[in-house]
Amino acid sequence: MTWIPLHCHSQYSILDATCSIKKFVAKAVEYQIPALALTDHGNLFGAVEFYKTCKQNAIKPIIGCELYVAPSSRFDKKKERKSRVANHLILLCKDEEGYRNLCLLSSLAYTEGFYYVPRIDRDLLSQHSKGLICLSACLSGSVAQAALESEEDLEKDLLWYQDLFQEDFFSEVQLHKSSEEKVALFEETWLKQNYYQFIEKQLKVNEAVLATSKRLGIPSVATNDIHYLNPDDWLAHEILLNVQSREPIRTAKQNTYIPNPKRKTYPSREFYFKSPQEIAELFAAHPETITNTCIVAERCHLELDFETKHYPIYVPEALQKKGSYTEEERYKASSAFLEELCEQGLTSKYTPELLGHIAKKFPGEDPLTLVKERLKLESSIIISKGMCDYLLIVWDIINWAKDHGIPVGPGRGSGAGSVMLFLLGITEIEPIRFDLFFERFINPERISYPDIDIDICMIGRERVINYAIERHGKDNVAQIITFGTMKAKMAIKDVGRTLDTPLAKVNFIAKHIPDLNATITSALEADPELRQLYVDDAEAAEVIDMAKKLEGSIRNTGVHAAGVIICGDPLTNHIPICVPKDSSMISTQYSMKPVESVGMLKVDFLGLKTLTGIHIATQAIYKKTGILLRAATIPLDDQNTFSLLHQGKTMGIFQMESRGMQDLAKNLRPDAFEEIIAIGALYRPGPMDMIPSFINRKHGKENIEYDHPLMEPILKETFGIMVYQEQVMQIAGSLAKYSLGEGDVLRRAMGKKDHEQMVKEREKFCSRAAANGIDPSIATTIFDKMEKFASYGFNKSHAAAYGLITYTTAYLKANYPKEWLAALLTCDYDDIEKVGKLIQEAHSMNILVLPPDINESGQDFEATQKGIRFSLGAVKGVGMSIVDSIVEEREKNGPYKSLQDFVQRADFKKVTKKQLENLVDAGTFDCFEPNKDLALAILNDLYDTFSREKKEAATGVLTFFSLDSMARDPVKITVSPENVIQRSPKELLKREKELLGVYLTAHPMDAVEHMLPFLSVVPARDFEGLPHGTIIRTVFLIDKVTTKISSAEQKKFALLQVSDEVDSYELPIWADMYAEYRDLLEEDRLIYAILAIDRRSDSLRLSCRWMRDLSTVNDSVIAECDEVYDRLKSQKVYSSTKKSTGAQSSAMIKKVETREISPVTISLDLNKLRHSHLFILKGLIRKYSGSQALSLVFTKDNQRFASISPDADFFVTDDISSLLQEIEATNIPARVLATTV
């Protein structure tokens, strides 16, 4: 007997079902089931994937949803006592009308009815029931709940649904009954009781529902509430439930596990994908309930439309004024408007200078004719294929952004190959001049809608998206949902935590998963140590097996970083929408690929901070010089720019800041924009291997050879090396007479490694090349090289567009360094490390970075004649609203004349005394009083005087005469310097760093700068590039000292936070070194040291081997240093193999401590510690909370591993004996260490 599963959950019922769509459908194929429904909880997330997978496997897909129905109104969001938040209801799509209604219902459940879960109500259901089949759902449905109450309630509920859905309403019966043998395996009495109570309810409901339904003429269907695939998947499912609840399903006690009664669990272990035979046995007394599932399936004949585009349309303004028009008239008008914009672009974009560049590229050709012919080709394809609206919509958004001063990038992706996009201003790089092809953007041989991605200034991105919403309607625009999945490492950690497996073991397994893209299976195959653990350790094997079952499960939802969907009418006419967690904007329920496949237009709005920097710099330059620079018009042959690159001074240059890029720029010495394009394409995994040849060929150190003379014009600009995908297209055209469209088809086939297609293309290429007079063996060799190259070839259009950004930033740095570095500092002011490097870069270019000044500084860092003036907004503790107030008053009433003048004019509603003190210490008032301590004393008196008088004036206490007196006899505040306590220069400098994030006016190392060349020191910025085991000399400033006690040996050690003039880093001083050098470990002390580079773990670590106070360094100290240095270099400092260090990460473990050891310290053994122990311990600490600080120290193999230092949650009662007794009684692997500081 055929049975159709109609109540099924996939992993899109997030953290409530384990079935992937692929395996779910495969199981239906195994059972030879002809149709299958998907009814995830409250959403349609997986509908398109499910539909396509079913179609691929010749199974009829039935798209449905188990909706949540509010007991009253969906707008009622108060939980009544003994009242359910929502009841369950199954809806299945019969046809397209039903699909639209289900999309709308699911959407409104999120946007209107969300309360714990997305909910509809009966009122909404009554309005949108057409085309839907309704099933009464499980025990959580209102029908089942009514059956448990009374026959009268049941009949009333059934009649309501029957009246609404007529013959398309089916009552639903389920029976998740196990054999007594299976029930006997339940470990807990309460679990058995839950099971029997559950089955008793199901039997009672089934009996009542079947009888009443029969009497009312309502057909019934038998379903199984599927949440996992196989009978033995129940445990993986239970683990998944408790990944969500964060309860361990069991807890360790002595040498065994005790089930956790607080865990989430299903009452039966029968929620798997049963076979038709199993269902037939369960419902043998009611075979019609099985037959009726086939009737439901027969009524469902939804066909999703993957051909129609639901793109928005563009109506030219002239046509809007007309009022009424046909679609033919509208498209004709849109086409004409597009052509009109292009004609305007021909005049404004193709200047004589640009046409001259094209003429130079194509001697003997009329450049404007070439442009017009190219435009004619592009227009014919774009207009005939109905793409005008798409281009005009993108043009409209970009044009609005530019009109409103929001910087937009010069192009991204293959769109930079289109002349039409260049004329419209969508891109800013001329394609003919740089051999960029339209066919790479839209291939005439295989026409499909292209992607046009938009780079936008980070600050203006939200405004642009809001414009798109306003322009096209809030119901027509949404962001795109994303689904976060359990990768291998996360699955191991989630499962290990839920099984309460020892943390050290869990993290040991996780550490052996090599990277984010690795699977557990591949890790087992590649790692003998992990494989051996799997064989030898049953506990580890259980974690791995369960994690394999859950690997890839969806864990959470998010929002796509850039993608926005724009539809021509309300989205819910075509797709469901939702509101993802932690998001305020509407999002699609379908992820990126499915949502595009059903005809939605995706536009990527990518925030690019570099554009913000360019905008700030060019505005500053315009203000200073009257010259408005634009990326599209700056000269591409500027010698200052190339000279800067030759020096490798690429800090602050887009995509060229890395050490590798600096070296590439110095070695290549680019002298043409085309070489900058090539740099962007070459510096990636794969083609990076060709960089040495590329450099050598440019400088004549390596011969440039071509496999055939026809390849020389194509590969000449890249010195005979294939770098771009477009070169494959050109070679195919030149040697084998491919059209550019055919060449793009070849490129795609090579990139996808489509073996079947490649066999055809090889034969086609070689035969056509032979017809063109090319030797077959040469043709085969060339094809082989093209095929190998295609796996890493780069899109030249994208490289050119981004190359223009690179060149623009280099041009700004070379010609307007102060303005450019000031702009970068403004963009990155909250990234202290970046600010430090930019300031160092400014110093290297002989540009001073000056402290903030009350009359020169504003919100941004600003270029002045003297240097770069620090931003007021970047001073810690001074908000932008205060800065706005200061600047507004300055612009309105002129510069501040003195500290008193400033305080007198300050708005005390916005400015506090503490903020003014911060401004003083930051140097903001040095122009009036360079002695900061004296300025603070004056400020204190001024603030008190004027704030009091302004308050009195505001309340009317001061009379007209007293105010007049104040005006005639202004307040005079004088403070004698002798009465002011003066801070030391070191203290002032430290305070400066606290407020500005960097040492600005001076650095403690300035005094010893002359010594450094003689000390052979390596700066911190070079550490990252050094190999494991390298011994180095360095100099640093101690910023912070944290003293600790090792748990194993009870010996003191220290963690230092240290820095040089640019970088900061952490440096441990272990017990043996600490005993020797403890007297040197003082904050603000300069140290000369020998360090060893340790790369045995995943990250760079440093180990200190010798140190001295830098102020004591003399010839004998240098000799001692040299002796230690030589000895360490001759030794094998570290083993070359990486050792397993056990636990690598945990939410409750910090590898870096920032507080001193506490009076009470408890040591926990990671080898025996379980997640449940931490829960118990946390509860006990709360139970015995008090004023005594507590630290937890984690050990592994008797070695200190990590610790948790005191915070608000780790203070216990002074009398800790009771706490310690309870800890001992719980079998937590803990011991109390000495309680002295």
UniProtKB/Swiss-Prot annotation:
The keyword Repeat does not apply. The keyword Secreted does not apply. One of its GO terms (biological process) is DNA replication. GO terms for cellular component: cytoplasm. Gene3D superfamilies: 1.10.150.870, Bacterial DNA polymerase III alpha subunit, thumb domain, Metal-dependent hydrolases. Keywords: Cytoplasm, DNA replication, DNA-directed DNA polymerase, Nucleotidyltransferase, Transferase. It is an enzyme of class 2 (transferase). Signal peptide: none annotated. It catalyses: DNA(n) + a 2'-deoxyribonucleoside 5'-triphosphate = DNA(n+1) + diphosphate. CDD domains: DnaE_OBF, PHP_PolIIIA_DnaE3. It is found in: Cytoplasm. SUPFAM superfamilies: PHP domain-like, RuvA domain 2-like. Transmembrane segments: none annotated. Its EC number is 2.7.7.7. One of its GO terms (molecular function) is DNA-directed DNA polymerase activity. DNA polymerase III is a complex, multichain enzyme responsible for most of the replicative synthesis in bacteria. This DNA polymerase also exhibits 3' to 5' exonuclease activity. The alpha chain is the DNA polymerase. Belongs to the DNA polymerase type-C family. DnaE subfamily. DNA polymerase III contains a core (composed of alpha, epsilon and theta chains) that associates with a tau subunit. This core dimerizes to form the PolIII' complex. PolIII' associates with the gamma complex (composed of gamma, delta, delta', psi and chi chains) and with the beta chain to form the complete DNA polymerase III complex. This is DNA polymerase III subunit alpha. The gene is dnaE.
